[in-house]
From Swiss-Prot:
Functional description taken from the UniProt entry: Plays important roles in the production of 11-cis retinal and in visual pigment regeneration. Capable of catalyzing the isomerization of lutein to meso-zeaxanthin an eye-specific carotenoid.
Family to which this protein belongs: Belongs to the carotenoid oxygenase family.
Cofactor: Fe(2+)
Database matches in Pfam families: RPE65
Subcellular localization, as worded in the UniProt entry: Cytoplasm; Cell membrane
Protein name: Retinoid isomerohydrolase
Note on cofactor: Binds 1 Fe(2+) ion per subunit.
Organism: Danio rerio (Zebrafish)
Length: 531
């Protein structure tokens, strides 16, 4: 799964450039044969505006949200894109400057205001961004573009028009929700975010949003908290990007990357600052793993711990013979990986990109196993008896259960990230295959498949081509777990038609078809296939 290619020409820089939205869809040139069951839309989100007037955005997660869509109908394909008209975007375009502080870019008061107006503008409270550039997913019959704050944005996925801004704080005790919910077959949505818990301490709430209502009312209005996880530190919640869910349990990994709440609140009231300034990490704090029963929502007060790591994406999580098995795209050590995702780093020449990545945390795919009955064995003995994994769990004298992982994949500066599975068939179940985007020193340059049982890998890769997260679509009559296709948007800057939707056979990553358009697209993070 290690990349075969170097990138001295620096074509990857093109995926970090501003794009214009389209007034109408562009027809795509199709090579190969689009599978007959693909009759829907591939929806993707990512940054598309990397400066406001003369003011640049500095971090990968600052660019304003651009929504992309490839439409498929009877073998014909079109491409369309529009900016999500968030408050952050509209005000940046209107005022030609950064108006709302983003992840790594600080907004300053309007220079046209007098000194007294500028002074008092610091004391109006925190203005949280609604820049929903990370993902899109359904809630009931509607679709929402999302980031990781309390705001989600309702969009029309047919026209890509922006419909409504929704503040989740109006419905549940939550400071923000992740862009990676779990969605059950009936449409029930589960998500996680930090909140103010008991005793004026920070905590983490699992939120449940019910499926489509019979009376067609908005399911968000019936959102509720189902269980709460405590925070290891009272005023420093961990950064949370995703969580695990089995049929009967929630799994939450609390990493040593913390948000300093006092620093966060003072950042806007005292001095110009951004979200990145409020993170801190400490290797000695290690990583805590929490579990809770799903029905009823009940926190299980076992003290599972492991060494410090960074974490963004869970791959899958399932129960087996009294154990919970969960697979992660981990990053070794305590340092925050986002420290290496400044646009200046990502746009650097190839040799500099490699030098920056060499000092960053090392990525690897890990499997951890949690014993649901950790007190059945004596102290110091391995509690894991599953025959197919080398992951261990041991009880320590202080009552904590120490977890050591099995490494499923590790390559030098070669990440398996943005993981996908056959979600409908195997989410929350024992499974075999994961699909991911391969990062070569943080440059996305291949699509990967991993057999988590045998550690066998497959790779799709072409020179000077930069794909996105692969989305799995199951064949309608598919029986095997990998009966289906992968869909990814690839940017090949030197080509006549530099962007294409690539369709791969999920069995062996062989190409089935591609739909090319004569336009460049910037990087995208996550998305979905809407049948």
């Amino acid at each position: 799964m290690v990349s075969r290619f170097e990138h001295p020409a620096g074509g990857y820089k093109k995926i970090f450039e501003t794009a214009e939205e389209l007034n109408e869809p562009l027809p795509a040139t199709v090579t190969g044969r689009i599978p007959s069951f693909i009759k829907g839309s591939l929806l993707r989100l990512g940054p598309g505006l990397f400066e406001a007037g003369a003011e640049p955005f500095y971090h990968l997660f600052d660019g304003q949200a651009l929504m992309h869509k490839f439409d498929f109908s009877n073998g014909q394909v079109t491409y369309f894109r529009k900016f999500v008209k968030t408050d952050a975007y509209v005000r940046a375009i209107t005022e030609k400057r950064v108006v709302i502080t983003e992840f790594g870019t600080c907004a300053y008061p309007d220079p046209c205001k007098n000194i007294f107006s500028r002074f008092f503008s610091y004391f109006k409270g925190v203005e949280v961004t609604d820049n929903c550039l990370v993902n899109v997913y359904p809630i009931g019959e509607d679709f929402y573009a999302v980031t990781e704050t309390n705001y989600i944005t309702k969009v029309n996925v047919d026209t890509l028009e922006t419909l409504k801004k929704v503040d989740m704080c109006n419905y549940v005790n939550i400071n923000g929700v992740t862009a990676h919910p779990h969605i059950e077959r009936d449409g029930t949505v589960y998500n996680i975010g930090n909140c103010m818990g008991k005793g004026a301490s920070l905590a983490y709430n699992i939120v449940r949003i019910p499926p489509t209502q019979k009376d067609k009312s908005d399911p968000i209005e019936k959102s509720k908290v189902v269980v709460q996880f405590p925070s290891a530190e009272r005023f420093k919640p961990s950064y949370v990007h995703s969580f695990g869910m089995t049929e009967n349990y929630f799994v939450f990994v609390e990493t040593p990357v913390k948000i300093n709440l006092l620093k966060f609140l003072s950042a806007w009231s005292i001095r110009g600052s951004n979200y990145m300034d409020c993170f801190e990490s400490d290797e000695e704090k290690g990583t805590w793993i929490h579990i809770a029963r799903k029905h009823p929502g009940e926190y299980i007060d076992y003290k599972f711990r492991t060494s410090a790591m960074g974490l963004f994406h869970h791959i899958n999580c399932y129960e087996d013979s009294g154990f919970i098995v969960f697979d992660l795209c981990a990053w070794k050590g305590f340092e925050f990986v986002y420290n290496y995702l400044w646009l200046a780093n990502l746009r650097a020449n190839w040799e500099e990109v490699k030098r920056n990545a060499m000092i960053a945390p090392q990525p690897e795919v890990r499997r951890y196993v949690i014993p649901l009955d950790p007190f059945r064995e004596e102290q110091g003995k391995n509690l894991i008896s599953l025959p197919y994994t080398t992951a261990t769990a041991t009880m320590r004298a202080d009552g904590t259960i120490w977890l050591e992982p099995e490494v499923l994949f590790s390559g030098p500066r070669q990440a398996f990230e943005f993981p996908q599975i056959n979600y409908r068939m195997v989410n929350g179940k024992n499974y075999t295959y994961a699909y991911g985007l391969g990062l070569n020193h943080f440059v996305p340059d291949r699509i990967c498949k991993l057999n988590v049982r045998t550690k066998e890998t497959w790779v799709w890769q072409e020179p000077d081509s930069y794909p996105s997260e692969p989305l799995f679509v199951q064949t309608p009559d598919g029986v095997d777990e990998d009966d289906g296709i992968l869909m990814t948007i690839v940017v090949s800057p030197g080509a006549q038609r530099p962007t294409y939707c690539l369709i791969l056979n999920a069995k062996d990553l062989s190409e089935i078809a591609r739909a090319e358009v004569e336009i460049l697209t910037p990087v995208t993070f996550h998305g979905m296939y809407k049948p």
